[in-house]
């Protein structure tokens, strides 16, 4: 079925030929439930998992290039550690591809327990110095970040783009955090992913990511960046944020539209989340264009003072009370523009000058007490 030499494909890699069938003879590289995943990943360049099977994995370590095709199988672990730990090489990134796996972190989300250092270990995938493609996977009920991408050291030379992380067509449900990228994990792509009932979708540290075409419904926060974050990793909060955040949907990502608390415990303080939350005077915001905010609030507390921020070409819809408020710190409000957006009167825009909202949309007001960190 396949022929792979040093990960250079000389014949097309076909997935399991009949997703509902258990075939004999099995495709080369098939990993059966109960067999050692460490041995299979070390021995094969392409590994097939059995359609519909369940695999109970605990801290499986990958140290070489491998492509894993899940065919809707389930990887499950109720212990506080990553299910798969990928240990790459910063200077010579290795290609790892994970496709069509379902990862289950627990029976249900534990929304009322404050986040802590212990919970950060409850992950599906912990990837150090990765060059990884994750496609078509599902992640359910993880107490920490379902996917954590980390750099082993700060990148200051020409290695920024070597990781080339791509996360596409995945589902996240009931997770504390969906995707966390640490410092110096840059130039990644997260596209066409669907988040539901998560507290935070993107825990953003490393910069220059493109996040496009993602949907967050009934999540408390789609985009979080501040200082002193969880999952900063060995590289710290270096060269953070910016990049692009375009054509995404924030649906009921506000204080009343989901089951997660607004309060979020960071290592040194508690913050009050928003659908889009940014608080770092040393960082630039991402390009923000074409996003749909249907009852999705926004807090812009701090950003680099010599920069501006434009909410461009979006759909801004709010409701009664404070549902779906866009609030900007007074000191920075003149640097924020709302250009070419549609919306309704229920959308409140706080502290942005009227001259910066073209055409007029929503209901503008001034309030020096907003946004509250």
From Swiss-Prot:
Looking up InterPro entries in the UniProt record yields: Pectin_lyas_fold, Pectin_lyase_fold/virulence
User: Which positions carry the signal peptide feature in this UniProt record?
Assistant: none
Q: Decide whether keyword Repeat is in the record.
A: no
Question: What quaternary arrangement does the UniProt entry report?
Answer: Homotrimer. Interacts with hexon protein; this interaction tethers the hexons together.
The task this protein performs is described as: Structural component of the virion that presumably stabilizes the groups of hexons but is dispensable for assembly.
Task: Please report which protein family the annotation says this sequence is part of.
Answer: Belongs to the atadenoviridae LH3 protein family.
- The protein's name in its UniProt record: Hexon-interlacing protein LH3
- Native source organism of the sequence: Snake adenovirus serotype 1 (SnAdV-1)
